[in-house]
Design a protein with these regions (language model features):
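Positively charged n-region of N-terminal signal peptides that target proteins for export
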Residues: 1-4, 204-206
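RTX-like calcium-binding, glycine/aspartate-rich low-complexity repeat tracts
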Residues: 2-6, 21-23
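Sec-dependent N-terminal signal peptides
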Residues: 5-14, 194
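Generic secondary-structure boundary signal with a strong preference for alpha-helix termini
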Residues: 14, 202-207
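Sec/Tat signal peptide C-region and signal peptidase I cleavage site
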Residues: 16-20
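Helix-boundary and membrane-interface capping/anchor signal
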Residues: 21-182
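A short, hydrophobic C-terminal helix/tail in secreted or cell-surface proteins
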Residues: 184-202
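Localized chelating/binding microdomains
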Residues: 189, 206-209
Length: 209
């Protein structure tokens, strides 16, 4: 099975090389991005909490050498409901690596828009995604620099992973951060306090009359 997956990834090099946009892969320093219902899995293991968001379940139990899988086909509006309208896609990759085992390999990752590949990540070597962050569902790596899309577009992802040596990896959409409640600036608070004092003074004058 491992040989088949590697062959598939290598064949993709020639056909995908013409696409200019390259997906970026960057390590995450610390437990920053965690998979939650607000950041649902696209490729999932049993620990994913997705709510009603569709995902492709990957083989569990560490009994496979790798994966060559396609995500469900999403509408752009479905993606925007997670990441926020007009925002760019950011995916977290949570690595499960067995103790004492070598680093595993992300061989290829693609985004398809309306059925055509528009973004590619390709790696010909091995061991480019060592586990870095402990804890359940935390991203060890980020995939970014995806093409823009419209609400009416369809979006799908293709995930090729090799040298798997532990439990299932997951790939999840990183949701838009929550908007904090508006807090008045100190100057605004001072002006508000002055205004309240003036109102109180007027009421006192009327009471004396």
């Amino acid at each position: 099975m491992n040989k088949t997956i590697i062959t598939t990834a290598l064949l993709a090099f020639s056909s995908a090389a013409a696409y200019a946009n390259t997906i970026s892969l960057d390590a995450v320093d610390g437990n920053v991005y965690q998979q939650t219902v607000q950041s649902p899995c696209v490729f999932s293991n049993p620990s994913c909490t997705n709510g009603g968001f569709a995902a492709t379940a990957l083989p569990t139990g560490g009994g496979v050498n790798g994966y060559d899988a396609f995500s469900p086909v999403y509408t752009g509006s479905t993606i925007f409901s997670i990441i926020g309208a007009g925002n760019s896609i950011l995916l977290g990759l949570d690595i499960n690596q067995a103790s004492g085992q070598p680093a595993q390999t992300l061989s290829a990752f693609y985004m398809l828009k309306n059925g055509s590949v528009v973004d590619t990540f390709l790696f010909a070597g091995t061991g480019n995604v060592p586990a870095g962050n402990n804890g359940n569902g935390y991203a060890d790596f980020l995939l970014s620099n995806f093409s823009s899309f419209l609400s009416t577009d369809t979006i799908q992802f293709h995930f090729v992973f090799n040298n798997a040596n532990d439990g299932t990896e997951n790939v999840f959409l990183i949701g838009a951060p929550g908007t904090p409640a508006s807090i008045p600036e100190p100057t605004s608070l001072a002006l508000l306090g002055s205004g309240l004092l003036l109102v109180a003074a007027k009421f006192r004058k009327k009471a004396k009359i």
